């Protein structure tokens, strides 16, 4: 649409897909598995160099939130279309993200971060933090996503088994067993704000998408404008999302997720440092 010639990379089983039909040039990646194709950083960078491409857009999924890939692209003399490696790292680690947002004045869900790596020390620190935060609460993996490494705890008697289970799942899924605690805000809505930022320090928000209908912490559908929003709340949440993006010098399209409590208060959940598959919902609303 912008008139720039494009190169698409694809695995053999994606040959002929719509995204390849829309590109000017297609490079077939060698390999059969995802690890051998869409996760092969060097092969992707080499495809860009071989075709004379000057920039790489990571799309969504796969390498789109890998800080080391952003660094590798830039080291190869190519332009990385997206946020800096620093922004990806800060927002990708949920405990660091909470601390960064707190410092930026963005409201975060009441809770505590526990940095202990040792299993026994971590569990004891989590127990003490749970007493301060209060029940019901959520245990969440610092590197988590998609509901993995997450446990709701309503009774202190269930805490130890839930914490141990969350840590095991987090290590298996992400190689990182660090867990933090958040107050469980029952009856809350899940609302995300679309932000866009350029390389000159200008950041805007494009309103919200409500994604409260979920199954196993996975979004089922998104709605825009959000049915529970009003203009005052939209602007307040939008400005908080802008502040979140500016706190890490964000560049590109991103999504800041919030919990909207029944009281009307809202709290930062996380930031997705990439374009999302839900982005077209916002495009339909904004044109």
Task: For every predicted segment, state its role.
Residues 1-256, 260-285:
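N-terminal beta-alpha lobe that positions the nucleotide/phosphoryl donor
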């Amino acid at each position: 649409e912008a008139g720039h010639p494009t190169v698409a990379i694809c695995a053999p089983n994606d040959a002929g897909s719509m995204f390849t039909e829309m590109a000017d040039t297609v490079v077939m990646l060698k390999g059969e598995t995802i690890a051998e194709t869409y996760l092969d950083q060097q092969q992707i960078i080499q495809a860009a160099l071989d075709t004379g491409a000057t920039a790489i857009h990571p799309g969504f999924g796969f390498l789109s939130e890998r800080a080391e890939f952003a660094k590798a692209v830039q080291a190869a003399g190519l332009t990385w279309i997206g946020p800096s490696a620093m922004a990806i790292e800060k927002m990708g680690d949920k405990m660091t993200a909470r601390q960064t947002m707190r410092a930026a004045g963005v409201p975060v869900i009441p809770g505590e971060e526990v940095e202990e790596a040792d299993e026994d020390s971590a569990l004891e620190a989590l127990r003490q933090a749970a007493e301060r935060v209060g029940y019901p609460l959520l245990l969440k993996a610092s590197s988590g996503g998609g509901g993995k490494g997450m446990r709701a705890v309503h009774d202190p008697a269930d805490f130890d088994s839930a914490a141990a289970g969350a840590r095991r799942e987090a290590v298996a899924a992400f190689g990182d067993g660090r867990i933090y605690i958040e107050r469980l805000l029952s009856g809350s809505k899940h609302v995300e704000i679309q932000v866009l930022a350029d390389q000159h320090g200008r950041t805007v928000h494009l309103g919200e998408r409500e994604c409260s209908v979920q199954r196993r912490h996975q979004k089922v559908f998104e709605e825009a404008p959000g049915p529970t929003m009003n203009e005052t709340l939209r602007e307040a949440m939008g400005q908080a999302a802008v502040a979140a993006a500016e706190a890490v010098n964000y560049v590109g399209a991103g999504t800041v997720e919030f919990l909207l409590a029944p009281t009307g208060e809202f709290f930062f959940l996380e930031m997705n440092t990439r374009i999302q598959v839900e982005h077209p919902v916002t495009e339909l609303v904004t044109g």
